[in-house]
């Protein structure tokens, strides 16, 4: 799943692997810029390990809807684990 060996992408890979997508086919994607796409908004993790990541695109109902163009970005910031995580929209 990793497209690059940079630490940022490795961190995002761990985050993506922690997300369960029981419905349909997940559209989790990573690019070299360190961005991630999740299958559903509900799939956003409760925590992000050692990373500050901006999620700019959320796929819904089998379709892809780019929310970054509307300025509706979601940033998840965490310290070292789920207990110290904060989520800001």
Swiss-Prot record:
Q: Does the keyword Phosphoprotein apply?
A: no
One Pfam family named in its UniProt record = Tuberculin
Keywords assigned:
Disulfide bond
Which residue ranges are recorded for the region named Disordered?
Answer: 61-89
Signal peptide region: none
Is the keyword Disulfide bond assigned to this protein?
Answer: yes
Cystine residue pairs: 27-59
Role summary: Tuberculin is the soluble, proteinaceous cell substance of the bacterium, to which infected animals become hypersensitive and react characteristically to dermal injections.
What other remark does the UniProt record contain for this protein? This protein is the most potent component with tuberculin activity so far purified and characterized.
Q: What is this protein called?
A: Tuberculin-active protein
């Amino acid at each position: 799943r990793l497209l690059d060996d940079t630490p940022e992408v490795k961190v995002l890979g761990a985050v993506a692997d922690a997300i369960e997508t029981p419905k349909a086919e997940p559209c989790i994607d990573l690019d070299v810029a360190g961005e991630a796409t999740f299958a559903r908004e509900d799939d956003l993790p409760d925590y992000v390990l050692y990373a500050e990541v901006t999620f700019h695109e959320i796929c819904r109902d089998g379709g892809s809807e780019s929310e970054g163009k509307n300025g509706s970005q979601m940033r998840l910031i965490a310290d070292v684990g789920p207990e110290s995580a904060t989520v800001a929209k």
